[in-house]
């Protein structure tokens, strides 16, 4: 490029460099999209805009990608490095309007015909200034919105700092030429496909147009389901039809979101400023699979785990910066207080009561509203656990909203609904102190403005945040596989509850929890907490802590929990340095070196972070506990022991493996433990290696409290086979609380009601107890004896004497 075009672009770039601060999606295009910068690259843009082209250029230069303004020289032929699909106002005729884009595609394809070694990467790129979807009654935007010069000027002026450059996966022109030829019809088809691609991409980033709120309410009121519910309300409460209708509108006002793009923009500014000061980084993994689903037209339902009130904001912020539409979020009615309620509503929150029981009108209005969101194509987010986890482990799922999601499919909608499980992890959860108090019996404090301000005032260094997108679950595919005749239940008017709905929803919910855990994120805090809590004195020398972290890291890297889980790339020493900056640990220095201590008052709180990744280490911990106790054991006997205990662990921690997969996993873990020198393998026997016995013992301690809990329940069951399930849960908790006090067990979940409730249900499912409550004493005693070998003698005596004392 030379002469006037160069001067023109330099002059145009002056105001743009000040006004435009764009973000690249993905954040690092070359590695994330597999672009090979050693091969020729050309860019395809949706329409002729110099502002777009220069915005793209800035991102290309920032990410070491070829400059789009520099022509591409191939076999002595100079070709522009970019193509505009649509024409537009032009200053220089050198650059291609729409008619010439086909000719340019053809020129590129033609070069591939004459040069068999050539392979140009065609990268579609869309540049967006602002992402307001507009309102339904407004002017309809075309799928590719081309602005004239004046419109573009104001768009850049007002939205320059809310601009995104979206790079798509490249298309190999070599493959196109080989598979489809190089004539002009292929070039025309390429241009047509590119236009469709950009239209879809815009919809995925901006979302469908928003309805006027009153129009939405009128449409809901006109639906047959709500009309019938209003009649029933008037009849059952002996009120007029108008009054019943007003009740329905009041419920809609209570429930419905009031989405505002301007509020999204403002909050994005505030959150961007806040995150940069509070978080040292937000790590996002597997977002490309979600972008692809949105691009393919899927109705997305985000199903994250629930750690903190921060989840709502963090996930919407991350999705917005990944080029996706922030979802409509199901939020607890407890958050509908001033000023948070109105703000959350404008950010897409719709509010849900804790229970629907006894209010048919409410349940009908909520179900119809949710169905309307799906039918209009809005993405939705809800927390399948129902509330925030107080222990750091996943809670048993609540299936009400999930059931309504499937009922929405049974209305006969055409868009495929896909559930996206999401693991959210933090190095600091601001409510963790409150959680510990609640687990100790304190009453939950009601959410309010003063409480919110107190929470915000405590925000300091929050370390790193993690958002890992798990394996998507397309509902249509799932139902086709598990309920082949599900389409027979489709009813476009009435909400239906076929016999298969409840068991199917329960299975989907359990599968979602497994997929959330599959996307777990290990980090500096949860790894250091796991190691220090494994030590009886909650302290280790820096060398010991480094060695223990290396053990965990090697296990997770060499035998990954799943393909979706993430492990830090930093060294153990770097992770310790980072964790120490979080001010949770104390360091005592002596002449020999540093001792890292987890203070007693922090120990209870730090169990929360350990529990975030308990599922990723529990199997190697159990193996280590068995080997440590037996000193040497054959693979077959080890496998038998693991097989007995695994169903309880699987149900409690939502582990991913089926029983028939265990032998391969245990073999892989045993080989890795041998490689680390924790054990030796001789004649198919695992032997403890005295040189690294401390590391093995600390690894084993990760399963210690879980095994103690199981021992309590199996001992009670053996001592009193006819005990009913409710009493078994209650007495298990009582003994666990006693054990906690006598043996200094700091984990609040050790005597958590939900944990024992889940365990007793698993015992029923596994046949240890029947529905009538009777247990088989020989079987339960056999399991207790296995567990008794894996816990210390003083703990065993406390368990056995506690029940004898009650007798």
From Swiss-Prot:
Keyword Methyltransferase assigned: no
InterPro entries: GPAT/DHAPAT, GPAT/DHAPAT_C, GPAT/DHAPAT_LPLAT, GPAT_PlsB, Plipid/glycerol_acylTrfase
BP-aspect Gene Ontology terms: CDP-diacylglycerol biosynthetic process; fatty acid metabolic process
Annotated pathway: Phospholipid metabolism; CDP-diacylglycerol biosynthesis; CDP-diacylglycerol from sn-glycerol 3-phosphate: step 1/3
Keyword Oxidoreductase part of the UniProt annotation: no
Main localization (coarse): membrane
Cellular component annotations (GO), alphabetically ordered: plasma membrane
Motif (HXXXXD motif): 306-311
Gene Ontology MF terms: glycerol-3-phosphate O-acyltransferase activity
Catalytically driven reaction(s): sn-glycerol 3-phosphate + an acyl-CoA = a 1-acyl-sn-glycero-3-phosphate + CoA
Subcellular location: Cell inner membrane
Membrane topology: Peripheral membrane protein
Domain notes per entry: The HXXXXD motif is essential for acyltransferase activity and may constitute the binding site for the phosphate moiety of the glycerol-3-phosphate.
Protein name: Glycerol-3-phosphate acyltransferase
Originating organism: Escherichia coli O157:H7
Record lineage: Bacteria, Pseudomonadati, Pseudomonadota, Gammaproteobacteria, Enterobacterales
């Amino acid at each position: 490029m030379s002469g006037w075009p160069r001067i023109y672009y330099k002059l145009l770039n002056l105001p743009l460099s000040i006004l435009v601060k764009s973000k690249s999606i993905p954040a690092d295009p070359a590695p994330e999209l597999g672009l090979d910068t050693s091969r020729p690259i050309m860019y395809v843009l949706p329409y002729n805009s110099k502002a777009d082209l220069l915005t793209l250029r800035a991102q290309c230069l920032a990410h070491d990608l070829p400059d789009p303004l520099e022509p591409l020289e191939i076999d002595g032929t100079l070709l522009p490095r970019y193509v505009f699909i649509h024409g537009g106002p032009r200053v220089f005729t050198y650059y291609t309007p729409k008619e010439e884009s086909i000719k340019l595609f053809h020129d590129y394809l033609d070069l591939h015909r004459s040069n068999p070694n050539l392979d140009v990467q065609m990268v579609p790129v869309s540049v967006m200034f602002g992402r307001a979807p507009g309102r339904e009654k407004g002017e309809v935007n075309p799928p590719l919105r081309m602005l004239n010069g004046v419109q573009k000027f104001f768009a850049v002026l007002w939205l320059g700092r809310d601009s995104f450059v979206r790079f798509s996966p490249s298309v190999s022109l070599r493959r196109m030429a080989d598979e489809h030829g190089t004539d002009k019809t292929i070039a025309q088809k390429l241009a047509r496909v590119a236009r469709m691609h950009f239209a879809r991409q815009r919809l995925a980033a901006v979302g469908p147009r928003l309805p006027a709120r009153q129009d939405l309410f009128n449409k809901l009121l006109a639906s047959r389901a709500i009309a019938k519910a209003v009649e029933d309300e008037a009849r059952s409460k002996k009120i007029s039809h108008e009054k019943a209708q007003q009740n329905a509108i009041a419920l809609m006002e209570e429930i419905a979101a009031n989405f505002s793009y301007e509020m999204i923009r403002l909050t994005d500014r505030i959150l961007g400023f806040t995150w940069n000061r509070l978080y040292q980084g937000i790590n996002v993994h597997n977002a490309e699979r979600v972008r692809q689903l949105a691009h393919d037209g899927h109705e997305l339902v985000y199903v994250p785990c629930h750690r903190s009130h921060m989840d709502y904001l963090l996930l919407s912020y991350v999705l917005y910066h990944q080029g996706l539409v922030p979802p409509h979020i199901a939020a607890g009615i407890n958050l509908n207080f001033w000023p948070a309620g109105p703000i959350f509503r404008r950010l897409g929150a719709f509010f849900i009561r804790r229970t629907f029981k006894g209010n048919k009108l409410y349940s009908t209005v909520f179900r119809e509203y949710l169905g309307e969101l799906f039918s209009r194509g809005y993405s939705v987010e809800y927390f399948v656990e129902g509330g925030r986890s107080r222990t750091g482990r996943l809670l048993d799922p609540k299936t009400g909203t999930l059931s309504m999601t499937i009922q929405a499919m049974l209305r006969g909608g055409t868009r495929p609904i896909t559930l996206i499980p999401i693991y959210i992890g933090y190095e600091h959860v601001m409510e963790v102190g409150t959680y510990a108090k609640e687990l100790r019996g304190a009453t939950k404090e009601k959410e309010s403005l003063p409480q919110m301000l107190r929470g915000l005032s405590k925000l300091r260094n929050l370390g790193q945040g993690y958002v890992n997108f798990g394996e998507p679950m397309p509902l249509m595919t799932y139902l086709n596989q598990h309920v082949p005749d599900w389409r027979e239940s489709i009813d476009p008017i009435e909400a239906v509850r076929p016999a298969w709905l409840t068991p199917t929803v329960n299975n989907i919910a359990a599968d979602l929890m497994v997929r959330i855990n599959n996307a777990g994120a290990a980090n500096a805090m949860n790894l250091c907490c796991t190691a220090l809590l494994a030590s009886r004195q909650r302290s280790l020398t820096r060398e010991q802590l480094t060695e223990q972290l290396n053990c965990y890291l090697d296990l997770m890297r060499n035998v990954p929990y799943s393909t979706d889980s993430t492990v830090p790339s930093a060294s153990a020493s770097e992770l310790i340095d980072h964790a120490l900056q979080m001010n949770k640990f104390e360091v005592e220095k002596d002449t020999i070196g540093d001792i890292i201590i987890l203070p007693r008052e922090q120990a209870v709180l730090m169990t929360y972070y350990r529990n975030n990744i308990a599922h990723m280490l529990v199997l190697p911990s159990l193996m280590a506990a068995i080997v440590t106790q037996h000193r040497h054991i054959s693979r077959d006997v080890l496998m038998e022991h693991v097989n007995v205990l695994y169903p309880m662990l699987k149900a409690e921690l939502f582990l991913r493996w089926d029983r028939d997969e265990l032998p391969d996993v245990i073999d892989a873990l045993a080989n890795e433990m041998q490689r680390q020198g924790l054990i030796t393998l001789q004649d198919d026997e695992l032997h403890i290696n005295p040189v690294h016995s401390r590391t093995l013992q600390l690894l084993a301690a990760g399963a210690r409290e879980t095994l103690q809990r199981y021992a309590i329940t199996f001992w009670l069951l053996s001592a009193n086979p006819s005990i009913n399930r409710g009493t078994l849960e209650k007495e298990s908790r009582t003994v666990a609380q006693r054990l906690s006090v006598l043996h200094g067990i700091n984990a609040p979940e050790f005597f958590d009601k939900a944990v024992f409730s889940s365990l007793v249900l698993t015992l029923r499912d596994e046949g240890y107890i029947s529905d009538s409550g009777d247990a088989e004493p020989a079987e339960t005693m056999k399991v207790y004896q296995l567990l008794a070998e894996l816990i210390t003698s003083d703990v065993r005596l406390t368990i056995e004497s506690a029940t004898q004392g009650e007798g």
